[in-house]
Design a protein with these regions (language model features):
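Hydrophobic, small-residue-rich alpha-helical packing segments that form membrane-like cores
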Residues: 3-7
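Active-site cores of enzymes that catalyze phosphoryl transfer or operate on phosphate-rich substrates
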Residues: 123-170
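DNA-dependent DNA polymerase catalytic subunits
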Residues: 11, 15-101, 107-112, 146-157, ...
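A short, structure-level motif marking secondary-structure boundaries and short turns
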Residues: 70, 140-141, 176-178
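Gly-rich Lys/Arg/Thr-decorated short loops/hinges at beta-loop-alpha junctions or inter-strand turns
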Residues: 164-183
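Short, exposed interaction patches on small structured surface elements
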Residues: 91-143
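A broad detector of the eukaryotic-type serine/threonine protein kinase catalytic domain
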Residues: 140, 213-216
Length: 422
């Protein structure tokens, strides 16, 4: 355990975050309390008193996800807005005090910045944008000093501010605050897509703070990288010019060319021809070596069997490398039905509640856990991992199944969904 703590610098991170927020290390998850400890002293020094907890529970929209275009592509770039929500707060002067001041009818329109849901934020006298600027500078200094625990602590604190302002448990909660962040993010992502496509490229996906761009005219990796660098430079300049022209604001939005996928797969939604969301795979080159990257797919999910994860890894590798894959699919299916892959058919899932608390729609891992006692096995408790297999009689403990394994269920639920994605 001590080696894990040393390798991950968890204690250094906890100490750094505790020192910055004023919370004890056993309360580091308290984002609202962290925000209060950072914001309230500044509010009081400005001569204002904080309100009680809000009774407004109006929901605000989440991150914007662009429809994906399923298919296999060469040369896909990921352009990512660095700390998008903190950048929006800084750029557009979004702040609880600024919102209150912006509602003063004596202020001219030029003295405020428009938000959403009829919000207006004062250009002067706000607190949160300056607090984020200070944290941003501290993070840059921590990065320069190679202080990763401090840098990570600051990043988490900054990124928590949107969630706090969107939480009814926050005394400053106001739907206009959170919506002015997320809806501005929607607008930024949409206009970024429009700019890229007007430049002759194609955006095949986007999610919250990132856009995925197909550089279809690139002949090799160098041309794709050059296009990524040019898009980064041009878009950052365009956003500076647009916000200065439209709002008379100094933009701190920063778009970065983050990743180049030499080959990229956007799968379809199961049973549909529509593109999926938050699920994709691709090949990146690092240090001269090609590496497969999976996001949201079966290969990175612990609740899928080793059979499915191994199958997906090799199947996608063959597809990306233009190698034959049809015979491979048949071979794996035949080996499964012949009982040659039994060791790879174990599901693993954690119990989130006590066994007695599951009454309706009892999931398979709970069914297997309830069989443990009668088969002389330790009974899993809440928080324990349950290993089970699917047999012709249903879910059974992996350590002591009685019925034969249901191979057809594994074909339909583990192999077929992976293959259908391609």
């Amino acid at each position: 355990m001590s080696r894990i703590f040393a390798h991950t610098a968890m204690l250094d991170f906890a100490v750094a975050r505790s020192a910055m927020t004023g919370l004890n290390m056993d309360r580091l998850g308290g984002s609202v309390a962290s925000f209060d400890n950072l914001y309230l002293p500044r509010l009081h020094r400005a001569g204002y008193v904080a309100p009680n907890a809000s009774t407004d529970h109006t929901a605000s929209p989440g991150g914007f996800v662009l429809d994906s275009q399923p298919g296999i592509y060469d040369h896909v770039l990921v352009l990512d807005f660095k700390s998008l929500y903190p950048s929006i707060i800084r750029t557009f002067c979004i702040d609880p005090l600024g919102l209150a001041l912006g509602g003063d009818e004596s202020l001219s329109q030029d003295a405020t910045v428009p938000g959403f849901l009829e919000a207006r934020f004062a250009r002067e006298g706000h607190i949160l944008p300056e607090l984020i600027r200070q944290l941003w500078d501290q993070r840059d200094a921590a990065k320069g000093a190679s202080d990763e625990p401090l840098s990570q602590a600051i990043k988490i604190i900054m990124n928590s501010f949107y969630g706090v302002l969107g939480s009814p448990g926050c005394r400053f909660f106001d739907a206009r605050l959170a919506s002015s962040i997320t809806r501005r993010g929607h607008q930024i992502l949409g206009r970024t897509r429009d700019y890229i496509e007007a430049a002759g490229h194609r955006v095949i996906y986007g999610d919250t703070d990132s856009v995925f761009v197909w550089i279809h005219e690139a002949g090799d990796s160098e041309e794709a990288h050059q296009a990524g660098r040019e898009l980064e430079r041009a878009l950052n300049k365009w956003w500076r010019d647009e916000l200065a022209r439209e709002f008379q604001l100094d933009s701190v939005l920063e778009l970065e060319f983050e990743t180049h996928y030499q080959r990229f797969l956007m799968p379809t939604v199961r049973g549909s021809d529509k593109g999926s969301k938050k699920r994709y795979a691709g090949v990146v080159s690092r240090g001269g070596e090609d590496r497969l990257v999976f996001k949201g797919l079966e290969n990175v999910r612990t609740d899928w069997t080793r059979l499915a994860r191994d199958f997906q890894l090799e199947l996608y590798r063959r597809v990306f490398m233009d190698e034959p894959f049809e015979d491979y699919v048949r071979q794996v299916t035949a080996a499964l039905r012949a009982g040659e892959r039994d060791a790879d058919l174990v599901y693993r899932k954690r119990l989130r509640r006590r066994l007695d608390d599951y009454q309706r729609n009892v999931p398979p891992h709970v069914q297997a856990a309830r069989l443990c006692e009668q088969r002389g096995l330790p009974v899993p408790r809440r928080g324990s991992w349950v290993e089970y297999v699917i047999t012709t009689a249903g879910a059974e403990p992996a350590q002591a199944p009685l019925a034969p394994l249901d191979y057809e269920q594994y074909v339909e639920r583990q192999l077929q969904p992976v293959a259908d994605g391609i």
